[in-house]
Amino acid sequence: MAGATVTVEEVRKAQRATGPATVLAIGTATPANCVYQADYPDYYFRITKSEHLTDLKEKFKRMCDKSMIRKRYMHLTEEFLAENPSMCAYMAPSLDARQDVVVVEVPKLGKAAAQKAIKEWGQPKSRITHLVFCTTSGVDMPGADYQLTKALGLRPSVNRLMMYQQGCFAGGTVLRVAKDLAENNRGARVLVVCSEITAVTFRGPSESHLDSLVGQALFGDGAAAVVVGADPDDRVERPLFQLVSAAQTILPDSEGAIDGHLREVGLTFHLLKDVPGLISKNIGRALDDAFKPLGISDWNSIFWVAHPGGPAILDQVEAKVGLDKARMRATRHVLSEYGNMSSACVLFILDEMRKRSAEDGQATTGEGLDWGVLFGFGPGLTVETVVLHSVPITTGAATA
């Protein structure tokens, strides 16, 4: 038998990309139903038949007033909720009704975002080699990744990865995974989709479960998609951000700070009051670990994409590292206009940042700055840290 003509090392080298993973396109989508935060307390207590809980309603109004959210989008309409009272009652068995919604709507909303990203990318969808789909709800087999593959008409041989119930840090997770896939598979083009529908967490108020009420004041529905690939073809692909490094860590002494449990009543969340404090206390170390190799220690010299879990988290992070208010502008804009969409938020923020940078005449997609950070915060407490590098804005770029 003749000996092998190539070595394993040569094969591996040929499989790997030359350059870093790059975001090549971004698309976002929301349900049509828009709810304004100023009107939401009256609506929420009316539809859940809880108007007799007057003190709790006043407390909820204060939560909404302090949320820094102007509006949110929700698939659940008043008409639908009126027909599904089990979803409006506090802790009523309702998982079947919720599941019936999300297994259909999660891939549908994800498809809308993916179509926009693929259109901006401008290449045949047959060039998509990998699909990473992330959602907090709607576990089924085959899953939303399969449904989206069918709905978009992707190749049957597309390599799929389905991520369920990761929570609010997962916008960073999907980029970390996409980076590894793109850089270790030469020519790969990874479609990443985060699609979040609050139907699994919506429920009526309870005086004994105020952390659930916090979620009702913050969460919204949305989907975002990005196309990621290394070694972009400059003739037909327009890079937006380079993914330089990515890391995940569990914060010390944070067990139980954020957790969720899927039960007959849907997905229940528990939050400790000290979540903003735990994140801000540890943000310096995360920044140092990520940027020390680059010789960067001025946190106002980089652009920021931070999961907007709530205004207190953003306020305390800003204070801890001495950030100028301008650094969180894109993050606060997404919180204001969409609420907390879990994993999709940071991708919405990337989209807002590159568009606003172009509109404002900035030199780069990162608000005129070269280096940036993307943070995901969620159950664990888990923190995802992604180091980004912007690209120069050319005429017509970054505004699609």
From Swiss-Prot:
Protein name: Chalcone synthase C2
Secretion signal span: none
SUPFAM superfamilies in UniProt: Thiolase-like
InterPro entries: Chalcone/stilbene_synt_C, Chalcone/stilbene_synt_N, Chalcone/stilbene_synthase_AS, Polyketide_synthase_type-III, Thiolase-like
Top-rank taxon: Eukaryota
Catalysed reactions, as listed in the record: (E)-4-coumaroyl-CoA + 3 malonyl-CoA + 3 H(+) = 2',4,4',6'-tetrahydroxychalcone + 3 CO2 + 4 CoA
GO biological process entries: flavonoid biosynthetic process; polyketide biosynthetic process
Taxonomic lineage of the native organism: Eukaryota, Viridiplantae, Streptophyta, Embryophyta, Tracheophyta
Active-site annotation: C168
PROSITE patterns: CHALCONE_SYNTH
UniProt keyword list: Acyltransferase, Flavonoid biosynthesis, Transferase
Pathway: Secondary metabolite biosynthesis; flavonoid biosynthesis
